[in-house]
């Protein structure tokens, strides 16, 4: 078992597990030779606050991207939909909502709906999902995924056929506002389309942008080679990278349109990237489906890159796994721990936000884990 939790809480956790006689103890890890840049997450995850981050009564919350506003408050943009229609209906019922807190650890309070349905004639007319919030030159810039369909908004779990139909329509777009409260300017076209016949022929999803000081942007995205129903026989998921002279576009793919290269994870299924820039490098945290890099399935890894195309992993690439240490001393293996989003302040990751589900699927919400100071600043 790898040590992911911060040292400041380790002694307490070990004492707690020893005194209670529980078998679920933490094991020490032999230190490895330091590398640069260091993995800012491994061994630096502090306890997750019980009751922190964002839970919405009667609703599923899936993921959350947080930014500090000019007023010093923290604004979370999250995907949410009624729990009555089940988890599957993210694809038809997801909407991006705003929640606010005075602390990056929450609890966040629901404020309003950010990008409401606007009609099936629009590419993002019926659902919005995967928010990633950024700020540049006084503007709040929200990257997201949208899709559309030409039937009534579902009030119960949709069929597999309907799921596949709407999934195939996923595209990345961007909206802009002067305030986190809006109003938001949306656009009639997505910023990046799939390319039938190539590795990214099905969708564009999971936007992970860096907006540079001059307003240009680098965008890592997820795609798949074929849409449904062919996707049922080909489940590949990979990352590509594009750039634009301005974050609104136009975007063109780098690396001759080929997928990016992650050392040690070639041909592995990956999703949910988040990237930031510090010290002349791009940094990434993302989910990997296999145990190839981290030793546990459906966990997270850290990588870095000079150009956004070739990514290197450190000696210990693990960023997180599904075991979460809470401030009450409990360690819970979550059913899901996905969509890692990072709050970066002064070039350093300070908090990780996750879409999570408890072991019984009884609560699906956003969870925050503080990160011990250090890392990439």
Where are these regions (language model features)?
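Positively charged n-region of N-terminal signal peptides that target proteins for export
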Residues: 1-4
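Bacterial N-terminal signal peptides
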Residues: 6-17
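Sec/Tat signal peptide C-region and signal peptidase I cleavage site
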Residues: 19-22
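Carbohydrate-active catalytic/glycan-binding domains of CAZyme proteins
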Residues: 24-377
């Amino acid at each position: 078992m790898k040590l992911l939790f911060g040292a400041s809480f380790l002694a307490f956790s070990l004492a707690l597990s020893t005194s209670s006689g529980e078998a679920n103890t933490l094991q020490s890890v032999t230190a490895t030779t330091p590398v640069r840049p260091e993995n800012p997450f491994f061994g630096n995850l502090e306890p997750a606050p019980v009751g922190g981050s964002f839970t919405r009564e009667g609703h599923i919350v899936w993921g959350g991207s947080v930014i500090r506003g000019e007023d010093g408050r923290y604004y979370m943009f999250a995907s949410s939909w009624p729990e009555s229609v089940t988890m599957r209906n993210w694809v038809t019922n997801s909407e991006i909502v705003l929640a606010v807190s005075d602390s990056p650890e929450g609890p966040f309070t629901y404020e309003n709906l950010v990008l409401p349905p606007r009609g099936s004639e629009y590419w993002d007319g019926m659902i919005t999902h995967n928010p990633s919030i950024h700020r540049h030159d006084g503007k709040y810039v929200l990257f997201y995924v949208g899709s559309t369909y030409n039937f009534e908004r579902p009030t119960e779990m949709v069929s597999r056929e309907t799921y596949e139909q709407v999934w195939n329509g996923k595209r990345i777009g961007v909206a802009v506002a002067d305030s986190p409260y809006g109003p938001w300017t949306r656009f009639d076209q997505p910023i990046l389309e799939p390319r039938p016949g190539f590795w990214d022929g099905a969708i564009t999803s999971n936007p992970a942008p860096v907006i540079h000081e001059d307003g240009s942007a680098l965008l890592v995205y997820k795609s798949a080679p074929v849409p449904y129903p062919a996707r049922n026989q080909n489940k590949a998921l990979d990352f590509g990278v594009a750039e634009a002279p301005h974050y609104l576009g136009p975007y063109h793919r780098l690396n001759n349109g080929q997928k990016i290269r992650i050392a040690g994870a070639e041909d592995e299924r990956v999703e949910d990237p988040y990237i930031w820039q510090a010290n002349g490098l791009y940094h990434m945290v993302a989910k990997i489906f296999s145990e190839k890099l981290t030793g546990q399935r459906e966990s997270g890894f850290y990588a870095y890159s000079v150009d956004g195309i070739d990514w290197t992993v450190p000696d210990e690439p693990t960023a997180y796994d599904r075991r979460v240490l809470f401030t009450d001393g409990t360690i819970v293996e979550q059913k899901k721990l996905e969509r890692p989003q990072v709050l970066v302040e002064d070039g350093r990751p300070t908090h990780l936000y996750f879409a999570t589900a408890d072991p019984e699927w009884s609560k699906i919400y956003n969870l925050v884990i503080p990160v011990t100071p250090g890392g990439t600043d």
